[in-house]
């Protein structure tokens, strides 16, 4: 049986970064069970590939939830500037949007994917696709690993697992390698969908799908105690709340929590009430038109929001009572929705859970239990916010494994 220097399992972003970042001259292999490599990378950023985010790397730590502090060494060792420099050196110019998101100048994810494949192959990491892995074992006699597929067996000195999670299963990210990882005695954290819509009881905005709000404040509460807060854009879909602020906070959401939204942040409830009162006396406009105008919100949403407050949106503004003004102000700034659940893996952008960070030396991503066994990217228990943070970790963790500093 041929002995490879390195076998990478997974031809997603992390696996391809590993091949592309490695020194040339190796006799290695990247194996994937999908029909095409990098399918999830191709759809990232709606096909435009939001590859990373602008700003100081120290600010990235908070963008990975509670586990962010544990990957500090990986992020600092290969930061966002390093990633942009790597792309530039390989012929890909980048552009930074006003919101800090960084994209290839072409706005084509395929440009980055093609470069990573070409670079990996040039470095000695050809791709073997449509190979479903059935077993992974370690050979204690010589410290190597044997990877079995439905069609063949492969032996390698070093094994890098970059198999992703369970989000977007149609792209091949289906969690099928988890049982084989557990068989190696690696501690796993139960997985759950992350960066998903939040569903609520009596949602009520089905007919307003597509309406969005910028820079709102979103809070999650449990027994009236705040457990998470996020500012950013939100989107109303036909079934749930979505958009960056919702997706980022969804990792903390659970059935029974309350989702509180201030649609006109930073305006407070009291300030909103004062603004309504400022010109309502003698005002003959219909209430929904008045509210829509002064708070610059879509009229259709104003109608529904006022109805949700138990008030007729078509009454004359001048007929509004004081308690009704208070209810409208509260609906705008602190309305609470009962969370019924979050999106499934088919809706998730990433996977929370996976290989426990306690099972890995986070300086080089090597297993603490098995030498020369590495885990990189989404297969680890790391899920970042929207905005390029997950692809940044794919790069940073791959670089840490390539450098292999003990």
Per-range role (PLM):
Residues 7, 23-46:
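Glycine-rich FAD pyrophosphate-binding loop
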Residues 35-37, 42-43, 52, 57-58, ...:
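An anion/pyrophosphate-binding glycine-rich loop and adjacent beta-alpha core
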Residues 48-96:
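Glycine-rich active-site loop/strand segments that organize a redox cofactor
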Residues 7-9, 31, 133, 154-170, ...:
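Short hydrophobic core segments
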Residues 1-12:
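Beta1/beta-strand and adjacent pyrophosphate-binding region of the FAD-binding site
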Residues 129-143:
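A conserved short coil-to-beta-strand element within the FAD-binding core of flavoproteins
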Residues 129, 304-383:
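A glycine-rich dinucleotide-binding beta-alpha-beta segment and adjacent secondary-structure elements
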Residues 2-4, 149-158, 229-231:
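Core beta-strand elements of the Rossmann-like FAD/NAD(P) dinucleotide-binding domain
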């Amino acid at each position: 049986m041929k002995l490879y220097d390195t076998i990478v399992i997974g031809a997603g972003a992390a696996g391809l970064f590993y091949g592309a970042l490695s020194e040339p001259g190796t006799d290695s292999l990247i194996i994937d069970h999908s029909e095409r490599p990098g399918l999830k990378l191709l759809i990232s950023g709606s096909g435009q590939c939001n590859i990373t985010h602008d700003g100081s790397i120290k600010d990235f730590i908070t963008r990975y939830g509670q586990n962010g502090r544990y990957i500090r060494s990986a992020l600092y060792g290969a930061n966002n500037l390093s990633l942009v420099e790597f792309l530039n050196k390989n012929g890909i110019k980048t552009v930074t949007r006003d919101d800090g998101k960084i994209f290839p100048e072409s706005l084509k994810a395929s440009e980055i994917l093609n470069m990573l494949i070409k670079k990996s192959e040039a470095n000695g990491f050809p791709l073997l696709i449509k190979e479903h892995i059935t077993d992974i074992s370690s050979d204690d006699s010589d410290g190597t690993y044997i990877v079995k597929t439905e069609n063949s067996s492969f032996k390698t000195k070093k094994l890098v697992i970059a198999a992703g999670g369970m989000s977007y299963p149609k792209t091949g990210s289906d969690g099928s390698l988890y049982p084989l990882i557990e068989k190696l005695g690696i501690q796993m954290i139960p997985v759950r969908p992350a960066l998903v819509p939040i569903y609520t009881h009596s949602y009520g905005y089905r007919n307003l799908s597509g309406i969005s709000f910028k820079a709102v404040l979103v809070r999650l509460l449990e027994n009236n105690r705040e457990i998470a807060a996020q500012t950013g854009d939100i989107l109303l879909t036909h079934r749930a709340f979505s958009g960056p602020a919702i997706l980022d906070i969804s990792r903390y959401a659970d059935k029974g929590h309350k989702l509180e939204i201030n649609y006109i942040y930073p305006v407070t409830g009291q300030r909103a009430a004062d603004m309504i009162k400022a010109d309502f006396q003698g005002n003959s406009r219909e209430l929904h038109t008045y509210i829509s105008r002064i708070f610059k919100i879509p009229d259709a949403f104003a109608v529904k929001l006022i109805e949700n407050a138990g008030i007729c949106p078509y009454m004359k503004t001048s007929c509004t009572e004081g308690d009704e003004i208070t209810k409208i102000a509260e609906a705008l700034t602190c309305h609470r929705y009962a969370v019924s659940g979050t999106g499934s893996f088919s809706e998730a952008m990433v996977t929370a859970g996976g290989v426990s960070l306690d099972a890995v030396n986070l300086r080089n991503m090597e297993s603490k239990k098995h030498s020369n066994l590495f885990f990189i990217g989404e297969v680890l228990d790391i899920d970042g916010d929207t905005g390029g943070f997950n692809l940044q970790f794919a790069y940073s963790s791959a670089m840490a494994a390539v450098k292999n500093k003990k």
